[in-house]
C-alpha cells in the first residue's frame, strides 16, 4: 500500500545517507571525496558538488554536460538537482562494494528520491550542520573516550537506527495496551532495538567469558577468576558469588 512504499523509500534512503556520512568522515569512500559535507571547515557546499564533474563516478558525457549546465545556472533548484544526480551516482558506485546496503534500485525508488543540502529542513542539513547536526566526532572511528576506547563506530549507527524507529515503536506499544492487533510490518520496530556496546560486552563476558575462565580453572585450579578477567580487560565480568554448601549441592 501507499504507507508501505513511503516507509520503504524513506528508510532505505535514510540508511544510505547515514552510511555515506559514516564513510566520508572516516575516508572510506572509493574516490575519497566527501558527498554530504566538506573537509574545509565552515564550507557548506559538499566537496562532491565543488569538484563535479571532475569526479570518479563513471559520469557519461551527457551527465557531465547536465552538471555543467546546473552549475552555470547557480539556482538552488538546479544545485539540488546536481547534488541529487551525484548522490545517486555515488550510490551506484557503492553497489559494487556494499550490494546489501546499496542495492540496485527499482525505478520508483530513485523516482521518489528527493534530497537537498541547501534546504535547512532537509535531513542532510540537519545531519552535517555544525551548529544543529550530529558532531562529526561521533562518526569518527578514531574518536576515543576517556579510557581510550573507540566511541564512534558502533554507537552512532545503532542510535540512529533506534531513534528512527522510536515513533513507530511507541505507537505500536500504545496499540498493544489497547489490545489492537499489530501487523507484521510493525514487529521489527518494536522488537529489534539497538543494544549498546556495554550491554553486549556484559552479556559476552558473563556467558562465553565465564565458560572460558571455567576451562582455564579446570586446567589450572590455581587460576584466580577475578585476576584473569582483569588480565583480559573484562570490565563487566562478575565473579561467581560464594554460595553455601547446601546451595552448591542443589546447583
List the model feature ranges, each with a label.
Residues 1-251:
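Preference for the N-terminal adenyl/adenosyl cofactor-binding alpha/beta module
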Amino acid at each position: 500500500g501507499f504507507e508501505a512504499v513511503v516507509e520503504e523509500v524513506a528508510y532505505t534512503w535514510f540508511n544510505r545517507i547515514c552510511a555515506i556520512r559514516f564513510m566520508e568522515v572516516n575516508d572510506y569512500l572509493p574516490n575519497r571525496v566527501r558527498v554530504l559535507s566538506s573537509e574545509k571547515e565552515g564550507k557548506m557546499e559538499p566537496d562532491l558538488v565543488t569538484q563535479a564533474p571532475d569526479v570518479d563516478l563513471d559520469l557519461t558525457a551527457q551527465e557531465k554536460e547536465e552538471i555543467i549546465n546546473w552549475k552555470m545556472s547557480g539556482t538552488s533548484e538546479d544545485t539540488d538537482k546536481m547534488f541529487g544526480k551525484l548522490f545517486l551516482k555515488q550510490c551506484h558506485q557503492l553497489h559494487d562494494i556494499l550490494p546489501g546496503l546499496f542495492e540496485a534500485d527499482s525505478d520508483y525508488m530513485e523516482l521518489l528520491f528527493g534530497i537537498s543540502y541547501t534546504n535547512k529542513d532537509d535531513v542532510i542539513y540537519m545531519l552535517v550542520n555544525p551548529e544543529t547536526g550530529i558532531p562529526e566526532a561521533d562518526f569518527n572511528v578514531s574518536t576515543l573516550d576517556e579510557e581510550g576506547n573507540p566511541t564512534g563506530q558502533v554507537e552512532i549507527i545503532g542510535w540512529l537506527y533506534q531513534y528512527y524507529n522510536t515513533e513507530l515503536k511507541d505507537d505500536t506499544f500504545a496499540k498493544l495496551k489497547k489490545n489492537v492487533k499489530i501487523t507484521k510490518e510493525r514487529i521489527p520496530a518494536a522488537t529489534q532495538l539497538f543494544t549498546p556496546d556495554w550491554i553486549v560486552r556484559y552479556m559476552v563476558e558473563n556467558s562465553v567469558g565465564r565458560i572460558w575462565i571455567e576451562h582455564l580453572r579446570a586446567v589450572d585450579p590455581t587460576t584466580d577468576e577475578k585476576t584473569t578477567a582483569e588480565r583480559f580487560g573484562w570490565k563487566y565480568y562478575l565473579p561467581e558469588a560464594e554460595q553455601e554448601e547446601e546451595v552448591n549441592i542443589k546447583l
